[in-house]
């Protein structure tokens, strides 16, 4: 009985002890002195957090956050470092977020606890100081663009981000813009006599894509004097460029004191494509004071294709160009008719490639001249003044009348001179050609003045419907189709029409004698299938 009493007493004591122990176990306590953390993207400062707890704890956080400790027991002051969220000043980075999590409880307490601290880091936003406008919006922006295009400036502001082209968004009137065109006329180029090399200096050529989106640029009224080897146009030099879908007009006034080239749209085109452009207004020149080439073109002054260096060869193309500009051009002291003369071509003044690179051509295709030419220069044509080397004229038409007061010219309404590795195909002249100088001693032909090189690559589909008038009483080098066909190149499928007047009197031409009036032929046997169409 005594033993039973002792056991009951012991159990009672143990129960009391256990009850006492349960009452002494506290709840886990855990708190921090920050409810959130915000840090900068660049050079973020460290942050200290005071942890108060009666527990063992562990810490987790994003990989871009580095804590001073990841576990511990009881109170602690924790320091946090943050990785930069900045790459460079040109790169945008996104803001990022995460949380710092501290979990407590375990061996020291009976219950666990968790605290979280949201952490946010700012991103970096690049603000372009010169953001793209998507294109050229007005005349003021165009003025800025054309200066940048001719001086090597950034064109990003006017480049459409979807197409990568400089895009004209509206019609532009430049007449109210103050642009120093003379200052932009500083590009120079040099080449040897046969144009076997070409070096462009003092400028950064335009090498992009300009898309006029069929808008008009009016009020282009430069007055410029060119010095030695200088070239000038709305675009001084186009190199590996495309210029398309634009109409340009104004009064283009340019003269020279030395060898120079100018075109209303492009001064010099190298390995470039110029397509679907229209040129209007007026082209005026008092010529040059030098006995060196001064070529002006309605579209382009000087076009080049072929070898520039060991790593670059290329072609140049004019396609779908229409010139409506009226021309007044007095050659000044240069009244010669050779390669060093003052010259004008409705599409281009002078086009060439190196002799050794006949495969890479300058091509003028599907182009039309409607502008009349009132001039006093040794070479003048509605399409191209000089096809020097490696040039193709295909499907071109001249509708402009030429009145020329030069004493001794080489005049043709499509092209004046055609030479090495050049081709004429489907060339039509509807314009009249009048040489008005007393005692005129030069040549005049409806299509061309002179084809003298033995290695011309072909002539076919030549058609003249214009009237040829001259005071050259000899009349030897005056013809409906050409003045001087001085080679043996096969020429075929042509149409001879129009009229010839010599010293005011009309020359009788009919089905019976028209082959005598197509022009001088060194070898008549090489000319075949020429059809006579009586003029209306």
Predicted regions and their residues:
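Short coil/turn motif common to extracellular beta-sandwich-like domains
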Residues: 42-46
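Surface-exposed binding patches on compact interaction domains or structured appendages
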Residues: 29-34, 48, 52-81, 86
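Bacterial Sec-dependent N-terminal signal peptides
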Residues: 3-7, 11, 15-38, 116-128
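Hydrophobic residues positioned within well-ordered beta-strands of beta-sheet architectures
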Residues: 47-49, 78, 98, 115-117
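Surface-exposed repetitive/solenoidal architectures
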Residues: 123-536
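A short beta-strand micro-motif common to beta-rich folds, especially ectodomain repeats
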Residues: 91-108
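Intrinsically disordered, low-complexity serine/proline/glycine/threonine-rich regulatory regions
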Residues: 81, 109-111
